């Protein structure tokens, strides 16, 4: 018998009080610390690449919105450290606003921030060599996971389409599901995917302002990418990617 697990999950994660939804008191002072603690993933033993500080973006916002599009044609140039710095900071970095908790450049349900960003650089240079990195959002720096050139065959092991081999880099988004589900139960899984979408549009708009080509990519080979990132695919798993260059 065929079971449509996507429909089953969607129904099971609806906000129904009689279906085991986590009961969230209206008074935040009664919440457990796990609901309000902001967790940051880091690699304390890995080398670091400090990214450039915030710089103003040029361009009229309405014009950026008009120009925003997906492209599969890239300039075939090495990654630019300054542009990558601004791309990460404006699209998924810390926001410069006065809050009682650290804000980001995108909305996150309950400020749980379940998404982690891994830049995978296909075409590098002396500033940022080809390799795999993790974006440390708190410090605005790259954790170096490993550095070595990518072959076309290795890129093909990660993504479905050949044109990706001409890109400069990819941004891989993973979801750390327990950060949301500890507060929102099964429904928290939905919020992880929504957050990936929020970040994705930020990346598109910032890339447009920086004159970087961008294409959201669902044709990922999830298990291969998770092995590349050395994540278990259960507590943390790939949810989205963007190809840039």
Region roles according to the model:
Residues 1-178, 183, 196, 210, ...:
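N-terminal accessory segments that position/regulate proteins before the catalytic core
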Residues 186-195:
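Short pre-catalytic strand/loop immediately N-terminal to key active-site residues, enriched for Gly-Thr
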